[in-house]
Amino acid sequence: MKKVKVCSPGTSANLGPGYDIFGLALSKPYDTLEVEKTEQGITISVDGEKAEEISTKVDENTAGVVAKKMMEDFNIESGIHIHINKGIKPGSGLGSSSASCAGVAFALNELFELGLSKLELVKYSSLGEAVAAGAPHADNVAPAIFGGFTLTTSYDPLEVLHIPVDIEVLVALPNIQVSTKTAREILPKEIPINDMVNNVGKAAGMIYALYNNDLELFGRYMSKDCVVEPCRANLIDGYDEVKEKVKDMVYGITISGSGPAIITIPKKEHVIDIENIFKDVWNCPVYYTKVGPGCYVEEIE
């Protein structure tokens, strides 16, 4: 095997009350990565969405950091070239950096037949997130590897729970800049016990809803975060307006990750109406898609 091409999905993290825990893999948008064996070293090329803003230096690129660590740990002596085609806009709130991290970890596991488990791939993938977010975290890379719905319940040791789900979502991507760093810095360092009780209760209810195929309950609780979303809503112009306009057309709506992407669980009969509202307010791309699989191989040479 000389080269492998993989698809790595966009993801939505938090989903309301599941801050830094819940994650959902999307069928679209997605990145494609090609990893090819070379004689020595690691080289990176990027095209697609905002490619000009993405560093190709190994230590400054999320995929490069993951690849370097894996190759050191497994004493891989050959080199590799990583080509990333960005289908997921960086800074969108749809796990763009995570797709690169997860995609390269998955590709290296295939290319060099390392035999790593999905949990081990999540662990390596999360290391690359430190480049984008300042610290390793797994709420996006976990669904990118596992697919479906994931819960990252512990980091020491790393524990990820996976629930296969069949849900359709409608995602808006406003053309608004939201810094992940800023979106984290504005969050409270302490919260009232009542807010904790609310969020734990709603998060638990979402899991119950998944196991009972209750979209209405899942969406209603997804919309009830009282800690993170209220802080971040002001970073996304028009969000409160949109939330009010679509409230009877969706089972649930919330900010995807740190934003600006907005994720909804739409009522099927209102999908077109919701899309029109998104476009009227934000004039932005909209994705109507299913919850998707994790990374998968598209081509092998």
From Swiss-Prot:
SUPFAM superfamilies: GHMP Kinase, C-terminal domain, Ribosomal protein S5 domain 2-like. The keyword Magnesium does not apply. The keyword Transferase applies. GO terms for cellular component: cytoplasm. GO terms for molecular function: ATP binding; homoserine kinase activity. Keywords: Amino-acid biosynthesis, ATP-binding, Cytoplasm, Kinase, Nucleotide-binding, Threonine biosynthesis, Transferase. Its main location: cytoplasm. It comes from Methanococcus maripaludis (strain C7 / ATCC BAA-1331). It comes from the Archaea. ATP binds at residues 89-99. Disulfide bonds: none annotated. Its EC number is 2.7.1.39. The gene is thrB. It catalyses: L-homoserine + ATP = O-phospho-L-homoserine + ADP + H(+). GO terms for biological process: threonine biosynthetic process. This is Homoserine kinase. InterPro entries: GHMP_kinase_C_dom, GHMP_kinase_C_sf, GHMP_kinase_N_dom, GHMP_knse_ATP-bd_CS, Homoserine_kinase, Ribosomal_Su5_D2-typ_SF, Ribsml_uS5_D2-typ_fold_subgr. Pathway: Amino-acid biosynthesis; L-threonine biosynthesis; L-threonine from L-aspartate: step 4/5. Belongs to the GHMP kinase family. Homoserine kinase subfamily. Catalyzes the ATP-dependent phosphorylation of L-homoserine to L-homoserine phosphate. It is found in: Cytoplasm.
